[in-house]
Amino acid sequence: VVLGKKGDTVELTCNASQKTTTQFHWKNSNQMKILGKQGSFLTKGPSKLRDRTDSRKSLWDQGCFSMIIKNLKIEDSETYICEVEDKKEEVELLVFGLTANSDTHLLQGQSLTLTLESPPGSSPSVKCRSPRGKNIQGGRTLSVPQLERQDSGTWTCTVSQDQNTVEFKIDIVVLAFQKASSTVYKKEGEQVEFSFPLAFTLEKLTGSGELWWQAERASSSKSWITFDLKNKEVSVKRVTQDPKLQMGEKLPLHLTLPQALPHYAGSGNLTLALEAKTGKLHQEVNLVVMRATQFQENLTCEVWGPTSPKLTLSLKLENKEATISKQAKAVWVLNPEEGMWQCLLSDSGQVLLESNIKVLPTWPTPVQPMALIVLGGVAGLLLFTGLGIFFCVRCRH
């Protein structure tokens, strides 16, 4: 039994017992001649394989009389007979085809269905291995739900029939962003860069996209920017005035927010709809903003935006242990010492965001010159009055 792949080429072997250029014939199960040798020439019969068969003439003198069938079809599956040296050799050919349901370019989250074409009477099994090493088994239909970005690449599928196997290679492209979610940490006032790299490359890439943003302080989300994508070039269709985002003109998709401000902190969802594809690509992006301030005798450190409850916010004097550290979005210190203070947002000891603020020494409030003059005048008047009374008393006595 020989297993072949639809659209591929197969070689059925037939060998003579001696190295000779004897006559040979290949026939199908109905005894119709397919090809053979007459003298030193290759001859062909009126079979349906006439235009798709050949033989290696260079091996005839070695007693090798193979038949090559090109562009295999499922209906080519049958028993073929080689007649040579008054003997007959039978070779059973089974042709299988394995194809993706509709397209080999699928969006992340969509399902992949592989369908096996097989000849009547066969009972094959299929086992596929994904690029990320996941094994899937099935019969004539094999389904893979919820494709992940890591499923993009070459799938290796083995079809088995009567202990014989044939291997298929199918290239699947999962259309997705490289990251499902990302978080940007910035100090108040810093410029913010958002990047949305794709996990695939296509020669022609056309579509449209939009970024919706839900600020932490806002009651509802709003569209910050819409854009078109044509042949890997990006053009902005509409952008809000506050904030006024800037967008790169080439891939990867790139957005710039001029300043990180507390009222911008929040999360966004960038969607990309590709031409001729059902559904959209999604990537979530988060912005966390930190502010460190001193007001009168109070030093405060705050963060805005989506943060994990596990994150720690700390205030510490430079080169000293943290004065305060807890899992909260705001911490403060009363009457801080002078010096450089650090506001730190950390995850299991790893600093994600840092902001420094210098606390200056506090001096006693200086007495104003006018106050000194007034006090001096009052003291002089009191002294003069006292002396006058003293001398008046003495005069009476």
UniProtKB/Swiss-Prot annotation:
Residues covered by the Ig-like V-type domain:
1-98
Its biological purpose is as follows: Integral membrane glycoprotein that plays an essential role in the immune response and serves multiple functions in responses against both external and internal offenses. In T-cells, functions primarily as a coreceptor for MHC class II molecule:peptide complex. The antigens presented by class II peptides are derived from extracellular proteins while class I peptides are derived from cytosolic proteins. Interacts simultaneously with the T-cell receptor (TCR) and the MHC class II presented by antigen presenting cells (APCs).
Residue intervals on the Extracellular side? 1-369
Q: What is known of its domains?
A: The Ig-like V-type domain mediates the interaction with MHCII.
Please, where does S-palmitoyl cysteine lipid attachment map on the chain?
Answer: C392, C395
Q: How is it modified after translation?
A: Palmitoylation and association with LCK contribute to the enrichment of CD4 in lipid rafts. Phosphorylated by PKC; phosphorylation plays an important role for CD4 internalization.
Name the UniProt record assigns to this protein: T-cell surface glycoprotein CD4
Q: What is its main location?
A: membrane
Every copy of the Ig-like C2-type domain together lies at: 99-176, 177-290, 291-347
Q: Which organism is it from?
A: Erythrocebus patas
List glycan-bearing residues: N269, N298
Q: Which sequence ranges are listed under topological domain Cytoplasmic?
A: 392-397
Please report any disulfide bonds recorded for this protein chain, giving both cysteine positions. Answer: C14-C82, C128-C157, C301-C343
